[in-house]
């Protein structure tokens, strides 16, 4: 099966799509780049920026074979942005205030020493699993490839789940007449990762939580208007925002050998895509030592936004 990437457009057996994210890399047989004008002529304007032909695996005549491969790994961010600790921050911020003619800041209620990057980052686990079954005779061929990818992100609550399928078959009715089909599909759940920007800006003098109430701690008054506690994004918001995508692309074809070097081929192609998203904004309460009772509400209301889109091209 040939996938042809044409100026950011993909062709799969005469079907042009916007990307090939439904392909499992384990099903790719080879890749070829076309650059010369003579090779690109048949693609017209779609090939203006070049063509990449991706050939996926198909069955070969021989015994039925089952291949299984699996891998696991971990990922961690080592090269983090250097930030100040609590004592360094207090010194530098007071220097700024004094140079502006203001009094030093009162840190009595702000005794934390938080590395916010440690709070939102994690060591992510990932696994990639693939199974393929192939078989062929003189009359028929089939190939089935299944894939599953699970990858935890470097940010807590971030997790990707992706299932892929590649199925193709070809049957020879006679020596000159053949039929077949190709089907590729994907089901993917994508995470909503947040909190990195806040982790780089939040003052280290604030603790993550209030020990008595268990509420997420607010930031000092000089930051509250611009920056929230990064855990609000990762624990309260990012954990509730999800999107799920489905996509199926395929075709059926028939071809007949008219003459020795002349073959007629008819193809019907289809591309179906569906996307569902859910965004939940909860009521957010934090601990603020500057208000009576300590408990403060940051948001006025909770809301749920859901979206669904479907497209079909043939």
Model-assigned labels for residue ranges:
Residues 4, 60-113, 139, 153-158, ...:
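Surface-exposed loop/interface segments of Gram-negative outer-membrane beta-barrel transport/assembly proteins
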Residues 79-81, 119-123, 133-137:
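Outer-membrane beta-barrel initiation region
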Residues 12, 16-17, 47, 126, ...:
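Membrane-spanning beta-strands of outer-membrane beta-barrel proteins
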Residues 2-35:
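Short acidic/polar hinge/loop motifs at secondary-structure boundaries
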Residues 34, 55-57, 132-136, 145, ...:
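Transmembrane beta-barrel domains of outer membrane proteins
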Residues 25, 61, 126, 137-138, ...:
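Outer-membrane beta-barrel channels and translocator barrels
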Residues 17-22, 43, 171, 256:
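A general structural signal for stabilizing positions within well-ordered secondary structure
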Residues 25-67, 126-128, 141, 147-152:
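A beta-strand signature from Gram-negative outer-membrane beta-barrel systems
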């Amino acid at each position: 099966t040939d996938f042809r990437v044409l100026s950011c457009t993909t062709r799969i057996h005469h079907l042009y799509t916007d990307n090939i994210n439904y392909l499992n890399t384990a099903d790719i047989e080879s890749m070829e780049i076309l650059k010369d004008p003579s090779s690109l002529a048949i693609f017209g304007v779609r090939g203006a920026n070049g063509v990449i032909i991706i050939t996926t695996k198909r069955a070969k005549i021989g015994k039925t074979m089952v291949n299984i491969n699996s891998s696991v790994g971990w990922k961690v961010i080592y090269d983090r942005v250097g930030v100040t600790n609590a004592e360094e921050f207090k010194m530098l911020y007071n220097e700024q205030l004094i140079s502006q003619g203001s009094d030093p800041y009162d840190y009595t209620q702000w005794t934390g020493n938080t590395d916010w990057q440690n709070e939102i980052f994690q060591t992510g686990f990932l696994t990639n699993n693939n199974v393929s079954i192939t078989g062929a005779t003189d009359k028929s061929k089939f190939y089935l490839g299944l894939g599953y990818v699970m990858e935890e992100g470097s940010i807590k609550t971030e997790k990707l789940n992706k299932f892929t399928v590649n199925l193709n078959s070809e049957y020879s009715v006679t020596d000159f007449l053949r039929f077949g089909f190709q089907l590729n599909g994907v089901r993917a759940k994508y995470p909503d990762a947040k909190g990195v920007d806040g982790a780089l800006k939040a003052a280290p003098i604030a603790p993550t939580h209030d020990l008595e109430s268990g509420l997420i701690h607010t930031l000092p008054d000089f930051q509250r208007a611009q920056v929230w506690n990064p855990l609000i994004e990762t624990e309260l918001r990012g954990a509730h925002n999800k999107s799920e995508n489905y996509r199926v692309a395929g075709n059926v074809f028939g071809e007949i050998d008219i003459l020795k070097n002349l073959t007629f081929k008819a193809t019907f192609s289809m591309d179906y895509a569906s996307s569902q998203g859910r965004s939940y904004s909860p009521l957010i309460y934090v601990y603020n030592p500057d208000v009576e009772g300590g408990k403060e509400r940051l948001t006025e209301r909770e809301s749920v936004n859901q979206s669904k889109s479907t497209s079909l091209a043939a």
